[in-house]
Amino acid sequence: VWFAMFAGLTTASVPAAGPSTPPPVSTPAPPTGEAALDEPFTLAYGSTAAVDGGNLTITFEGIVEDSRCPSDVMCAWSGQVIVALHIEAAGEDAQTVELGGITDSEGVLRPQRPELSTVSSAAVGEYTVELLTATPYPAHANEPPSEAEYTLSLVVRR
């Protein structure tokens, strides 16, 4: 079975600073797109969408697992995809959620199977975020997609 595991760790070098220089401050990335409630939208790897006038932001942090059977391989199990989303809702603590499941060969999530521990939607405050698609579908066993190639389709409901 083919796996592409998300490392999720980055390092940055910070120049040496004297005692009077404050440490760098991490600020959230500005939204790279806007989305409406109840309307599907796409989110590329590393991008952030502002939903409902910015009351909810969703950032596609990475691929936790993509064990979907590549198109050029015969597998006993079709595998699944799990993605990590950083979600911030107004008045709520920010959280990272993992959504996923089994998809068809076009990356569209199929109805969830009870024996799998993955979920395709999550409640955050007054919102429900649902994963609809995860593409690209792996085509070749020896050439898994890079994280930068992934795009998700999501919908947010209140």
Regions inferred by a protein language model and the residue ranges of each:
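Surface-exposed, beta-sheet-biased, low-hydrophobicity segments with strongly acidic/polar composition
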Residues: 15-158
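Sec-dependent N-terminal signal peptides
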Residues: 1-16
